[in-house]
Amino acid sequence: MPFFIILTARWRFGDYLLFIMETRTYDELKETPETKKNNARAALSEFAYLGGYKPWNFRKEALEYLAIKKALSEKWSFDGEAEDSYSILDNYLRYTFFRLFEENKIEYTKDGKWACFNTGLVNQTYVPIYALFQKNRNTGKQPWYFCAFIADGEKWGKFPDRCSVADFPRRPRRAQYLDNPSDLLYLVSEEKNELSLNFDHIFDRAERLPIDLLNELSGKQIPIKKQRGDFSNQIDYETYLSNYNDELQNVINEGNTRRRLQERFKTAVDMTRDRIVWNYKTAIPMYYPSTGKISLLLPLNLVKEDKVDLALVVSKGDGGYLAETIYPLNWAYRCARLICRPDSDWLTPSTITNDSEDEEDND
């Protein structure tokens, strides 16, 4: 039975780190609550060996083949990234797999030798593209290993070990995110659809706010947030983030800064609502993997009127819309891309830098 070594606890004693590890089978792992909450992104790597230099990464050649030669043309990297990083594509495939796993849409051949899932992507003639896996013969590893991206009518492998989509009892289906088409739209014409802002929760994520905005409203000079690469280990980085956020919270709660910040948000939201009236595509649907929720993304111009700084995450309830948190634009794009490629004039990878680290599981 394949098993995985899982980090379950860690403590720090002076300059030493103590790690507590345990082993679990794949079936045990997929049933644990933390898998859904914390490991949505890791689910595909736990399911299959992906062939990369690091075993949890795709081979670069595989992503390149999919992006350039197989799938309909699309930009899969953010501004400032190498074109061949394919960070958006990698993220898309991982969370698409997790959604399909939740929906029980991973398909298997009757002999148990092959597995397959629908990537949701299409080729130049709009034929669906699938990810194909073969049973892993290496014991103690992931139960499957990645073989190829194939379209309908294509076979992979050497005789007699060849496989196509037609060999599966059921054609792999796409991930489903929407039950109600109205979830795609932000309705501004009805009074019952007023937008409420949960400022307490929004400002709890103070490190996501533009530093220029906080400096302007507080009259201070706050240092720019450091990145993970500035620290030798994850624990030191997490400690720094906690302290940095506490510092920003103190700035927000001093004097009139909080009131000014709320007023700036309200002004930005008013402009966004006018923008939605002008173009309903301004509001972009997104899927939040760890909760399975559909929300809408709205642009927030907080510092300059001609520049979007953040995405406001809005959910619809019986009494209207509620804005509970804010996302950096790279997070927003990745979550939106799971549903479809955004047809947007404000959320495009060519104008977004990937300078916020992957913490989407923390809303």
Please identify what each model-predicted range represents:
Residues 15-16:
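Intrinsic-disorder-associated, low-complexity terminal segments enriched in Asp/Asn/His/Tyr and depleted
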Residues 5-8:
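Ser/Thr/Pro/Gly-rich low-complexity, intrinsically disordered segments
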Residues 361-363:
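Short acidic DE-rich linear segments
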Residues 19-291:
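An acidic, glycine-rich, mixed-charge low-complexity segment common to nucleic-acid enzymes
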Residues 293-359:
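Compact beta-sheet-dominated globular domain cores
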